[in-house]
Amino acid sequence: MLNIQFFTFNPFSENTYVLYNENKNGVIIDPGNWNEKETEALENFIKEKEIKINEILLVNNV
């Protein structure tokens, strides 16, 4: 099963997604964390769920 968690970060309300499976393998899509508080929220979620991030995908670059 694929799990999806999203966060809305920064003054531009950029959505960041963490996708992970039952084996705790995951990817981050469009990390838009802007400050320390937002970075901590993302890191804490990943640590809490014990997700191993295998890739970071940037799909909304200009």
Named regions from a protein language model:
Residues K52-V62:
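Metallo-beta-lactamase
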Residues M1-K49:
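Conserved beta-strand hairpin/beta-sheet module of binuclear metal-dependent hydrolase folds
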